[in-house]
């Protein structure tokens, strides 16, 4: 799986324009071949900070999306930004769910207080 994270720092007063652009992209992008998920997040402390997270089945699907007109629209929002887009692409080779959380928490509760302290130090 490939995850692309895009951070946007929008010029004050351009928040709604950016939001409309991003919202218009959700449905068509989510329907693209290989798109697992597409989410837009807004910082609760600063409405001018957005994070766009997309998950793709393969790098080929992501590359096809990056070459699309729709992604070009996103790149064209630079006039709305205080600074350039921050883009990170991650290749995920393994992922775990809630069972991993439960397992880790069980493991911690079985440790003695001394072992837990040592574990934090290491």
Locate predicted features.
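Short alpha-helical
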Residues: 13, 47, 69
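Short, well-ordered beta-strand segments in beta-rich or mixed alpha/beta enzyme
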Residues: 2-8, 39-66, 104
